[in-house]
């Protein structure tokens, strides 16, 4: 199962990166139920939860009403109204920071926010992630491509989980700016594995887990292929729910 990770006074800030149908949204949706309080900022209208709201202030009021609350803010209708979107995000962030227990805010489709001019919203989420150690708030960000993740948001993340890449430009970005050829090879293997097993009806796929700190926390187990773990130990291939035979489970 997914680990419940702690860093100081919050869970880790995570990025989930992968093309459509790669298991990225599935991983984010499943992992949130291992946290007591989560808010999913959803512009697609496809994410479900026990509590779904259309206004940011209603989501903010729901935080902490019960010991375990998972809410979704369906805000796709606000993509053409950056000011109202920002106001909703601020209300949610403030409520999460005031709550006495840990809260995770899931900020999906970051590339769409970036492309449609929601710079202030992205900047505010960066601030929430940066001060999360003191306030007990963590942020998970999701994007389809690695180059879509804004530098200021990427700087406050603890880990990135790659569920695959969509094209050569994505791989070239990883090669040039992130993890060189070894990481590219691992993500390619994950992508190939997904394509092969998806035809067989699989719904869960492996991913590459990379630590931003560069700490050497991973090592290959006997019999593991070389591409399942980096030489310096700062990334490895893991199963999405800690099962199966590819790579090794985590937690």
For each feature predicted by the language model, list its residue ranges.
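Conserved P-loop NTPase mechanochemical-coupling segment
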Residues: 63-84
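Hydrophobic/aromatic beta-strand patches that form the interior of the parallel beta-sheet core
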Residues: 14-16, 37-41, 53-54, 71, ...
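Accessory, usually C-terminal, subdomains that scaffold auxiliary metal cofactors
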Residues: 186-197
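Flexible, charged surface loops at secondary-structure boundaries
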Residues: 7-10, 32-35, 63-69, 96-101, ...
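Conserved P-loop NTPase motor module
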Residues: 1-10, 14, 27, 36, ...
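Walker A/P-loop NTP-binding active-site region of P-loop NTPases
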Residues: 22-59
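Conserved P-loop NTPase motor cores
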Residues: 14-32, 83-181
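A short, well-structured beta->alpha microelement
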Residues: 1-4, 50-69, 90, 94
């Amino acid at each position: 199962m997914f680990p419940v990770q702690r860093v100081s006074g919050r869970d880790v800030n995570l990025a989930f990166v992968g093309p459509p149908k790669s298991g990225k949204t599935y991983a984010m949706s499943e992992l949130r139920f291992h946290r007591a309080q989560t808010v999913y900022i959803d512009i697609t209208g496809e994410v479900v939860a026990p509590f779904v709201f259309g206004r940011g202030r209603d989501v903010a009021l729901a935080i902490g009403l019960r010991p375990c609350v998972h809410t979704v803010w369906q805000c796709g209708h606000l993509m053409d109204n950056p000011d109202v979107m920002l106001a909703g995000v601020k209300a949610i962030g403030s409520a999460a920071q005031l709550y006495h227990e840990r809260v995770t805010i899931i900020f999906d489709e970051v590339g769409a926010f970036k492309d449609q001019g929601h710079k202030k919203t992205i900047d505010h989420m960066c601030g929430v992630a940066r001060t999360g150690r003191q306030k007990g708030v963590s942020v998970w960000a999701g994007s389809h491509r690695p180059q879509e993740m804004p530098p200021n948001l990427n700087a406050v993340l603890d880990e990135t989980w790659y569920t695959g890449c969509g094209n050569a430009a994505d791989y070239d970005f990883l090669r040039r700016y992130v993890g060189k050829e070894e990481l590219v090879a691992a993500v390619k293997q994950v992508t190939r594995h997904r394509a092969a097993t998806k035809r067989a009806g699989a719904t869960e796929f492996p991913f590459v887990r990379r630590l931003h700190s560069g700490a050497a926390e991973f090592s290959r187990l006997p019999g593991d292929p070389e591409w399942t773990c980096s030489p310096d130990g700062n990334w490895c291939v893991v199963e999405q729910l800690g099962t199966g035979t590819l790579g090794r489970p985590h937690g």
